[in-house]
Regions:
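A surface/extracellular/periplasmic glyco- and lipid-processing/surface-interacting theme
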Residues: 2-32, 39-297
Length: 297
């Protein structure tokens, strides 16, 4: 099995404005953003994936988990760190491929109500591992490398590789009405900088660095609403379409996920699995009925 530091930890992070600022997100390897409820302007929640979690002093605030999060965590063989969730998640957390820690982290007095005060602090993960039988190593459910990364000396240039298909992508405005997520391309460092609620998203745990990414994967995804309280699940074990965005260009792609533990794969128009650039990756699941409001320009 792999070294302990190679196993991903996946944290559920609140994205209501009162939960800001978020701690630790700028250290994440992959950040997912998706609708968390069909109510409240289809409010989103972050799911952040950390490999070197031990080097991050504070992550959060930590909130509850949803079925979609459990399914997506399984494709990374990640351990989910959360605080509870609706009963709809139980059958997914009970799957043999799912490992999780719930509500076993630290409280930080930040002057906010209790639901916004739980964080993962240094040492919390070690305590959880020592008091459980959850493995720090990849388990038998790990299906191997997730993305195909380009060599850093030969980065992906969509304009060159797909001259007829790539479009300009200096700004990506996501159809998330509650928080208004958007990413702006900086040609100097070739990264996309994330903003929401009309302002830059900064990490006070990292000198107020703005959240930024090398790769954006935007997926259109159907969903099923469970009840009148807004609880829902994305149809993420399925197939669909989307965009891969990097270095100022976007490429229309298709995606496919065949089982709970199988990684989501992305393909170009010729059916070849795409290669992405080395660096941090942002993944957005966009409800299919909001897809037409996605802006890439």
């Amino acid at each position: 099995s792999s070294a302990a530091s190679d196993v991903y930890k996946r944290q559920m992070v609140d994205n209501e404005s009162i939960a800001l600022p978020h701690y630790g997100l700028s250290h994440a390897d992959v950040v997912y953003e998706m609708m968390n409820s069909t109510l409240n302007g289809r409010i989103t929640r972050f799911m952040a994936l950390f490999k070197d979690y031990e080097s991050v002093d504070q992550i959060g605030s930590i909130r509850s988990v949803r079925p979609t999060n459990v399914i997506l965590a399984a494709e990374w063989n990640a351990i989910i760190c959360h605080d509870g969730g609706p009963f709809y998640v139980d059958e997914y957390l009970d799957e043999a491929c799912s490992d999780h820690f719930s509500g076993t982290f630290s409280r930080v007095d930040n002057g906010k109500s209790r639901e916004y005060t739980e964080y993962i602090l240094s040492g919390d993960m070690d305590k959880n591992f020592s008091s459980s039988d959850v493995s720090k190593d990849y388990t038998s459910y790990y299906e191997g490398a997730h993305y195909q990364f380009a060599n850093e000396n030969n980065p992906v240039d969509l304009g060159t590789s797909y001259p007829d298909d790539a479009i300009d992508a200096n700004m990506v405005d996501l159809p998330f009405p509650h928080n208004g997520s958007y990413l702006e391309y900086n040609a100097d460092d070739q990264l996309y900088y994330y903003s929401e609620y009309g302002k830059a998203h900064v990490d006070p745990g990292n000198d107020n660095a703005q959240l930024c990414f090398k790769n954006l994967l935007i997926q259109s995804c159907g969903y099923t609403q469970y009840d009148e309280h807004g609880y829902m699940i994305f149809d993420c074990i399925s197939s669909g379409y989307g965009y891969y965005v990097t270095n100022g260009k976007a490429l229309y792609v298709s995606w496919k996920k065949t089982s709970m533990t199988s990684p989501t794969r992305y393909y170009d128009a010729q059916g070849n699995e795409i290669t992405i650039n080395t660096g941090k990756t942002y993944v957005a699941l966009v409800p299919v009925d909001d897809w037409e409001d996605l802006v890439i320009e």
